[in-house]
UniProtKB/Swiss-Prot annotation:
Family: Belongs to the Fmt family.
EC class name: transferase
HAMAP family attached to this UniProt entry: Formyl_trans
Record protein name field: Methionyl-tRNA formyltransferase
Swiss-Prot/TrEMBL catalytic activity: L-methionyl-tRNA(fMet) + (6R)-10-formyltetrahydrofolate = N-formyl-L-methionyl-tRNA(fMet) + (6S)-5,6,7,8-tetrahydrofolate + H(+)
Example of a GO MF term: methionyl-tRNA formyltransferase activity
Organism: Zymomonas mobilis subsp. mobilis (strain ATCC 31821 / ZM4 / CP4)
Name of the gene: fmt
Domain of life where this protein originates: Bacteria
């Protein structure tokens, strides 16, 4: 099958690789333009652009798909289908209708729940028991298109990085299955109830609110790990917590209850396990405390 692939971050790589391994003809790869990154702020290509060039594929990085010339180039590929995985740009109606089989999206939630940009993080924050992947036929709405195939996976104690990686690989498998026998997966309209919106994550949400209890704080930590990393402030320094456990011990909100950084959250408490000081690598809590003590009774903000 002649495929246009559209994706940008690491999440999209398993699907691109799976399509290549399945023997499909990738006639073009679309990704967002290179962004300034690193200390020198030199333009850095997206993970998908980098991988596509390694594979010798034709790569396009338009800032928009609305221009007539950009749409003509897209149409000239005469693709059977466009496969989209976390591309990040709006697909106009003209683009959606160009491929013979339309545009299929790998979405990281059980639609109609968590439509939008951050379904993995929002599912963890909400305390959902399960997540998954929906292969959907794209339309002009925000993740409102008909569903072709769904697979669930338990969230358990996974953080956003681990869950996203798992979902990405499930999505790659499902997309290959759908394209192998498209007639076996007729589109099914999404339910009219149960929808929710997964707003893009804002870094301001990463400050841990211990007043909401240890259970919610632990969800917040998993939802923001590994990036941007949920954090607290100590002497005006941001200290990220990348892994933590809930403890039954009650304690004053935001106060350290011992010399091992057990943090009070009202009726329960939070025990950090993996932490990261500003500008340093992540490490076990005990390694940080050897040279950076935070004494009992400290009030964290």
């Amino acid at each position: 099958m002649k495929i246009i692939f559209m994706g940008t971050p690491d999440f999209a790589l398993p699907t691109l690789n799976a399509l290549v391994d399945a023997g499909h003809e990738i006639v073009a790869v679309y990704s967002q333009p290179a962004r300034p990154a690193g200390r020198g702020k030199a333009p850095r290509p997206s993970p998908v652009e980098k991988r596509a060039r390694e594979l010798g594929l034709n790569v396009y990085t338009p800032v928009s798909l609305k221009e007539a010339e950009t749409q003509k180039i897209f149409a000239d590929h005469q693709a059977d289908v466009a496969v989209v995985a976390a591309y990040g740009l709006l697909l106009p109606k003209a683009i959606l209708e160009m491929p013979r089989l339309g545009c299929l999206n790998v979405h990281g939630s059980l639609l109609p729940k968590w439509r939008g940009a951050a379904p993995v993080q929002r599912a963890i924050l909400a305390g959902d028991q399960e997540s998954g992947v929906t292969i959907m036929q794209m339309d002009r709405g925000l993740d409102t298109g008909a569903m072709l195939k769904i697979e669930k996976t338990p969230i358990a104690d996974k953080n956003a990085g681990a869950l996203s990686d798992e979902i990405a690989h499930i999505g790659a498998k499902l997309m290959v299955e759908v394209l192998a026998q498209p007639e076996q997966y007729p589109p099914v309209k999404q339910p009219e109830s149960g929808e929710s919106y997964a707003a893009k994550i804002d870094k301001s949400e990463a400050l841990i609110d211990f007043s909401k209890g240890a259970v919610q704080a632990e969800r917040q930590i998993r939802a923001f790990a590994p990036k941007p990393g949920a954090f607290f402030l100590y002497n005006e320094e941001r200290i990220r917590i990348l892994e933590a456990h809930v403890q039954n011990q009650a304690g004053a909100v935001g106060e350290t209850l011992d010399d091992h950084l057990l943090i009070g959250c009202g009726s329960d408490s939070l025990q950090p396990v993996i932490v990261q000081r500003a500008g340093r690598k992540a490490m076990k809590l005990e390694d940080m405390l050897r040279g950076f003590a935070i004494p009992r009774g400290t009030r964290l903000s």
